[in-house]
Amino acid sequence: MSHNDTVRQSFKKQAGKFTVYHMSKTEYTDYLIQKVAATGEEHTLEVAAGTCICGRALAPFVKDITCLDLTEEMLSEGKRLAKENQIDNIYFQLGNAEKLPYEAESFDLMITRLSFHHFAEPEIPFREMQRVLKTGGKLVIWDMEAVEEPLRVANDKIEKMRDPSHTRILSREEFEKMFQKDFVLQCEESTLVPVNLDSWMELTATPKEVREKIIALMKNDIYGGCSTGFSPYLQENKIMFDHRWLLLIGVKNKEDREE
């Protein structure tokens, strides 16, 4: 099975629960819209959009938005919710972030949320986003930020146990390196997002035996055993941890640069 097939299989299972799970995080989406500061004239693309959480939230503030995703079931849920909310400037495209079906310099604004840790080769979709973004346009990436190096392997291992489509969480430095050549960063900030362990595993329908292993690892960490890289803690007798989300907003350079 190819990695893209693994992604489709994983998110097909998540489609019906995805929006409900992320409704508890609407304040973060609201903050994102504020930071994007759209003018209302942007032709916009959301890449690896899932159920188009950002696209639906951003639609009232841009000229139009296209939501592209690899998984048909996720887009179908996005279409249903857009219709339910009477959003009429949103469009949906089944497609691969590694080969965007658009001409160069097609969009004024591009956004992708929680996608890069599912890409097998993150540089490829990044270059594609850079290609189809207009000079002077904004690229917005909101994704998880890797924990410090000694703990990254353990952290990614548990992420992959929970969701086989997970590849690797990138560090701030790795994101900065991708932006370095063709963008000027306007925003670079991180936020801690609390996560309930049970809800997190429920979203991906993690098998019972795998859940039990993850719970055991988290409990062991809480009580002084081997670190998981998640820094889990108890809150009202529930296991919690904080994901660090990194928001980067870059403006594509107006100067052409030699390769």
Residue ranges, per PLM feature:
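A short glycine-rich, Lys/Arg-flanked "PGG" loop and its adjoining helix->strand segment in the class I
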Residues: 123-135
